[in-house]
């Protein structure tokens, strides 16, 4: 198993050119803790079974994404549900490029200095969604700390263009934390709100330094609460990955904090290490434990809890938004 240790006395990596995507060891070399690579990835338990993403529908959606120069988080983040979702004719779109300004060592999305925004992306995204005849779409993004509003206006532009071509569609946004730009970002978002506002806490506060460098647990909670105060009729949603070293007690505490901040929906899923250079899996949470978390969440008052090993933030998001049980 790989380990995480504090760095001391190491030379800082050089500046990255615009448009160069760093992944794996190059990416995690730029965080405040050192990831010692795993010698061998842990064997997954029997309850984690993933469909191989091979079907005509998978190929069709990938070709459509390339045609319109779009990205799906399903591919970029190596989501284990890619085959199931693509085969069902759905996808979670990732806007603002495929290079993130953050360096989270659990995530497989590339890091670097992103290119300027593609002004045609809102239109191209709307056309692609109309071509696919989708009824529920999740839109997420890389972090864009280089933008004065964190990319909030680009999100709003995308929602507006999609609604023009697909009247009646439901849109969920999975947004970054808008670090240092919360007020302007939320003002923009409130003027063109999604149907579900999602921002993931990802893990428990104790693990933020090693798991989410550059992010702040309390800031993320405040983002969700302030949006809810501004647009009270729109459901808010957040999620955690389990298996990074948290305890069950810490998970329950975070769930309670979420409810204190008026978060309506919750997702809980198993962290799966993308490569030997990413954060190690500390435990595989049993399905019975996920079921227990779901029961506790419902008791706390969440409107919907999706809790299971392969649950991800946008996994069957349409069903969760409609109140169906996911897990």
From Swiss-Prot:
GO molecular function, one term: metal ion binding
UniProt xrefs under Pfam families: LIAS_N (PF16881), Radical_SAM (PF04055)
UniProt enzyme class: transferase
Binding annotation for [4Fe-4S] cluster 2: 100, 104, 107
Catalytic activity from the UniProt record: [[Fe-S] cluster scaffold protein carrying a second [4Fe-4S](2+) cluster] + N(6)-octanoyl-L-lysyl-[protein] + 2 oxidized [2Fe-2S]-[ferredoxin] + 2 S-adenosyl-L-methionine + 4 H(+) = [[Fe-S] cluster scaffold protein] + N(6)-[(R)-dihydrolipoyl]-L-lysyl-[protein] + 4 Fe(3+) + 2 hydrogen sulfide + 2 5'-deoxyadenosine + 2 L-methionine + 2 reduced [2Fe-2S]-[ferredoxin]
SMART domains the UniProt entry points to: Elp3
Intrachain S-S bonds: none
Domain Radical SAM core: 86-303
Key word Protein biosynthesis present: no
InterPro entries noted in UniProt: Aldolase_TIM, Elp3/MiaA/NifB-like_rSAM, LIAS_N, Lipoyl_synth, rSAM
Keyword DNA repair among record annotations: no
Subcellular location: Cytoplasm
Key words, A-Z: 4Fe-4S, Cytoplasm, Iron, Iron-sulfur, Metal-binding, S-adenosyl-L-methionine, Transferase
Metabolic or biological pathway: Protein modification; protein lipoylation via endogenous pathway; protein N(6)-(lipoyl)lysine from octanoyl-[acyl-carrier-protein]: step 2/2
Entry's cofactor comment: Binds 2 [4Fe-4S] clusters per subunit. One cluster is coordinated with 3 cysteines and an exchangeable S-adenosyl-L-methionine.
GO cellular component: cytoplasm
Protein name: Lipoyl synthase
Gene name, Swiss-Prot/TrEMBL: lipA
């Amino acid at each position: 198993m790989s380990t995480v240790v504090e760095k001391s006395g190491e030379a800082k990596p050089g500046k990255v050119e615009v448009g160069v995507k760093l992944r794996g060891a190059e990416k995690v070399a730029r965080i405040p803790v050192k990831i010692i690579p795993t010698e061998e990835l842990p064997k997954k338990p029997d309850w984690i079974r993933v469909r191989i993403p091979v079907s005509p529908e998978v190929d069709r959606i990938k070709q459509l994404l390339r045609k319109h120069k779009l990205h799906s988080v399903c591919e970029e983040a190596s989501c284990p549900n890619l085959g199931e979702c693509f085969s069902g004719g759905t996808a979670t779109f990732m806007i603002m490029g495929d290079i993130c300004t953050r360096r989270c060592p659990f995530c497989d999305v590339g890091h670097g200095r992103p290119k300027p925004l593609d002004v045609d992306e809102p239109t191209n995204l709307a056309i692609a969604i109309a071509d696919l005849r989708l009824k529920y779409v999740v839109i997420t993004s890389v972090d864009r700390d280089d933008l004065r509003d964190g990319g909030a206006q680009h999100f709003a532009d995308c929602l507006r263009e999609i609604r023009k071509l697909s009247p009646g569609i439901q849109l969920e946004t999975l947004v970054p934390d808008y670090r240092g730009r919360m007020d302007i970002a939320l003002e923009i978002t409130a003027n063109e709100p999604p149907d579900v506002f999602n921002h993931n806490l990802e893990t428990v506060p104790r693990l933020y330094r090693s798991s989410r460098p550059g992010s702040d647990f309390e800031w993320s909670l405040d983002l969700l609460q302030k949006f809810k105060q501004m647009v009270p009729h729109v459901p808010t949603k957040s999620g955690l990955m389990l298996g990074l070293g948290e305890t069950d007690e810490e998970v329950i505490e975070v769930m309670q904090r979420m409810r204190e901040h008026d978060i309506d929906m919750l997702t809980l899923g198993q962290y799966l290490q993308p490569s030997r250079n990413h954060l190690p899996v500390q435990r595989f949470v049993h399905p019975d434990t996920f079921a227990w978390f779901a029961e506790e969440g419902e008791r706390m008052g969440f409107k919907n809890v999706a809790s299971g090993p392969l649950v991800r933030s946008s996994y069957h998001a349409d069903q969760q938004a409609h109140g169906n049980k996911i897990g």
